[in-house]
Amino acid sequence: MLDYIPWIGNGHRYGNDHRGSNSSTSGVTTQGQQSQNASGTEPASTFSNVGVGLKANVQGTLGGSQTTTTGKDIPKWPTLDQANLQLWTGAGWRNDKASSGQSDENHTKFTSATGSGQQGSSSGTTNSAGNPDSLKQDKVDKSGDSVTVAETTSGDNLTNYTNLPPNLTPTADWPNALSFTNKNNAQRAQLFLRALLGSIPVLVNKSGQDDSNKFQATDQKWSYTELKSDQTKLNLPAYGEVNGLLNPALVEVYGLSSTQGSSTGAGGAGGNTGGDTNTQTYARPGIGFKLPSTDSESSKATLITPGLAWTAQDVGNLVVSGTSLSFQLGGWLVTFTDFIKPRSGYLGLQLTGLDANDSDQRELIWAPPALNRLSWQLGQPLGPRGECVGFQGGVGGSSSVRLASSYKYHHRNEGYLIGAHQCFGLSGELYRPGFVQGFHSKLRPKPKHLPLPALGAGEKSRFLW
């Protein structure tokens, strides 16, 4: 079964076994500041289970008699050990079990985490299924091996949090969406998409320690006003990450925006007058985030969803095939390769235009910065030696970042393919606060199954998205 949703992490694993290692002497961020560790053993970008998913121990073989249920309002979970059920919503609950198996386990009840079933309110008992605002706090008391879990709204033993964004309601059908019994379930497709795009925020463990105070309510920041004084506290959907680290790679480099614009060749667009005069129009898929402006207190990190309401009509046709997962989003087919069992530092994304008459129809390949050994610090990509790359002229004055010759493309049916002399360029001229960073690329993949549009006459490079 799909037991976790991988996403760009910061070296800390949550529910998977992948942990990257950066052999550089610098460039890894810790609580928003560049590490000065010279030992060369800092963790590199890898995958963390910070989204939506489900983990559980398999209780018996499929089709066996060991079938359990979580209650009358929750669907049955064949072969799953309910005592070890770990539900991951990313926005209010996770089960971080200590390695010793004794202390610090989050015993938040299933109904409290999902909003399913009957829960009390000031006006009496009401059904709050699918309403995150109605989730109850749970208090855990331990005496030896005995654990008592009770709902509470105050105290020192809270295991989930009140100060979550009030406007996030991923789906009104949490139990069905989380059951994973129907791989084409529309609600589950919504949860996948929201998790993968980072629209479900995560809780910040600022200390990085696994103790009773690992999640402080004061560290969960959602407003731009709170962000302005210290960006390391940001936990808005566009930047959701664990351990207080800011990871804007999703938006800054791999951001998907509905904005249309133009490229003037290698020199970029806008204020640059030294590039080619040949202007090429580019279009971007209508999913992604708009960065908050640094000079506006009212600016927010906004989810861009033009014409999309996250309904079954907009997000559907979810198909799991081998290690790949794909679903339809508007006019795009979104495919995540190596999704179910991702290797360290790799998760491929293809965006394929579904309109055969679209002259810009193409497949785009996405991969996290672990591939080219970049790390991130407050919106700036850092090279293996901690140097800033891309936005300020790049390494050695170049306006692009050249990947190692060992950069690999992976195709599920054909194995590994080497793409020689690949170059991802980050245009310094086009970067400005408050706007999604363009993906300026001279990518020339040799594999014919990874098509990119040919450059026009006089066009030195092109924005892909």
Swiss-Prot record:
Sequence segments annotated as region (Disordered): 9-48, 59-78, 93-167
Basic and acidic residues: bias regions: 135-144
Disulfide bond annotation, renumbered to this chain: none
Highest taxon above the source species: Bacteria
Bias kind Polar residues: ranges: 38-48, 145-156
Ranges of biased composition (kind: Low complexity): 21-37, 111-131, 157-167
Family statement drawn from the similarity comment of this UniProt entry: Belongs to the adhesin P1 family.
Name of the featured protein: Putative adhesin P1-like protein MPN_286
